[in-house]
Amino acid sequence: MTGASPRPLMVLGTSSGAGKSLMTAALCRVLQRRGEQALPFKGQNMSNNAWVDADGGEMAYSQAMQAWAAGLEPCCSMNPVLLKPRGDSTSEVIHGGQSVGIARAEHYYRDWFRPGWKAIRTGLMQLQQQWPQGRLVLEGAGSPVEVNLQRRDLTNLRLAQYLRANCLLVADIERGGVFAQIVGTLSLLRPVESPLIKGILINRFRGRRELFDEGRRWLEANTGVPVLGVMPWLNELFPPEDSLDLLERKPTRGATDLEIAVLRLPSLSNFSDLDPLEAEASLRLRWIQPGEPLGEPDAVILPGSKQTLRDLEAMNSCGLADQLRAYAQAGGSVLGICGGMQMLGRSLSDPEGLEGTDQRCSQNGLGLLPLETTFSGTKRLSQRSIDGLWPMETPLSGFELHYGTTIPDAGLQPLSSDPGLGWWAPGPKGSSVVGTYLHGLLDNGPWRRAWLNRLREQRGLQPLANDPKNHSAHRDLLLDRLADAFEQHVNLAPLLQP
């Protein structure tokens, strides 16, 4: 840490899901408003919700969002260690944006602690060299006081001590037990760590803040740590970071013009692709787990998958595959993204075992598009800018993040000027089956609106206006609303002390 840099800030949480990611994003946007250059950083993240930076490096989507909040383009130095769970007690390990191996849970800290700490220090050095006057805004992971893991901690208090960061402890009051969470966390800190905690933040409080005044006084009297703020319930501003948290989301809209079903398969990844649809007031998303009925939605989306063959097997075993075939044959529209597109094809082959299955295998797909996919070679990681051809001619941007090569039958219509990036086929009653490798396709406002208007036409509804903005504009508005609430409800002065 250079002497010219302002003191780093760190957002810790009493548990997973406490709201660390959003509070870190809020801090980044508030500092940007005050003329500071915030530098978001999470040493190690575990997530299958990923982003690809301009140099082809892979990082967690939550750090990309924090970069946008800070007015920066995301770069993988902001998240130098990314673990991508594969569902079998193993994770793909990403260091500096590139895949470096597969780790088993029981051996991770034995085999990967030293390389991970080296990658974290390298990421910090790269950020500080590029922005020497910037202020690091760090996000912790889970709880900082998991006693069995403290000796090998990579991203919480080890990092806070290393950088002498001023720490804010966030606790989620919505889930109950907030006093025990806070007191328990503070009591488990080691003496050298306790002075790093400069304040407590109560998150997701419902009702008038005055109702928590007695709780604030009790916490300050019994812990000696000031409560710097009480943030109101803002959970619907952004979708959750963890796919498990999708199970807790309840529909917030009443009657809408359209309903789109999204298959929440066991190895769901990159569900941030659905954020633009979450923001569309004219529709609602209904997440479907294996075993639940498909119903009669206006469209079905198969998102990305970390384990495509296993998710396809899950669909077959619970009858969801047969339901989807019948739905498409009856005139239902289907959109598959990345692994979802691969499942829509005729066959999937994994001769090198890249999918992590017990044996190299081939498997029949859903047969809704004439595609043959082979998992081989290296992972494709790149940002893309291309010309869309269907359902309208419009510029498209996004990124590729996948293993595998997909070959279409001759005559299948390409989705864009890159004939290997996606395809579409017409179905009965004006429906369509669409598949693409382009993550972020729905972020493109004109494309999204044209696709939704085709669904509306199937329903006999009037089209929506053809002047939609890209989702980045809506996301920026939400970040401003988040920062507005943070500035209103949180006293930052103790946290910003040198």
From Swiss-Prot:
Pathway: Cofactor biosynthesis; adenosylcobalamin biosynthesis
Active site feature: 338 (nucleophile), 439
Domain of life (superkingdom): Bacteria
Keyword tags: Cobalamin biosynthesis, Glutamine amidotransferase
Pfam families reported for this sequence: CbiA, GATase_3
Molecular function terms from GO: ABC-type vitamin B12 transporter activity; catalytic activity
CDD domains documented for this protein: GATase1_CobQ (cd01750)
Signal peptide (UniProt feature, chain positions): none
Protein's GO biological process: cobalamin biosynthetic process
InterPro entries: Class_I_gatase-like, CobQ/CobB/MinD/ParA_Nub-bd_dom, CobQ_GATase1, CobQ_synth, GATase_3, P-loop_NTPase
Claim: Membrane is one of the keywords in the record: no
Positions of the GATase cobBQ-type domain: 257-447
The family this protein is said to belong to: Belongs to the CobB/CobQ family. CobQ subfamily.
NCBIfam families referenced in this protein's UniProt entry, alphabetically: cobQ, PRK00784.1
Xref: PANTHER family: COBYRIC ACID SYNTHASE, DETHIOBIOTIN SYNTHETASE
Main function: Catalyzes amidations at positions B, D, E, and G on adenosylcobyrinic A,C-diamide. NH(2) groups are provided by glutamine, and one molecule of ATP is hydrogenolyzed for each amidation.
Name the UniProt record assigns to this protein: Cobyric acid synthase
